[in-house]
Amino acid sequence: MDLCNPKEIKALLGRHGFRFSKQMGQNFLIQEWVPRQTAEASGAAPGVGVLEIGPGIGPLTAQLARRGEKVVSVELDRTLLPILAETLSDYDNVEIVPGDILKTDIAALCRERMPGLPVVACANLPYNITTPVITALLQAQCFQAVTVMI
């Protein structure tokens, strides 16, 4: 499945009855080069864990999974979980964690889910939560690099 193809995305979301939430500021990446270049810039590599925030339907997650040792993605919108289960089923190094990153002990999450690995963070964030998320990531003091797309 091409996670950056608007027709395929529309069909996928329709099958799952998904509706965008204005409150969550949801937007999905539809240009293939954006998740690819973001993943390249993130520092994801063999032997490196990746914390991703807000995977959406998974195009950035898939790119990170191709590069990193393990990807832990935190997703607030539970209606996206069955979609992610479908779109990321080929990646056994991806773990989706339902929850709010702003209510998560980020350092503990990284220690528990990616023990012994150096970790980078990567996200495509809605504008309205950019500052608190970046602040939380920096306060966690557990990342080799933080890559955020706004």
What residue ranges belong to the model's regions?
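Catalytic cores of RNA-modifying enzymes
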Residues: 1-150
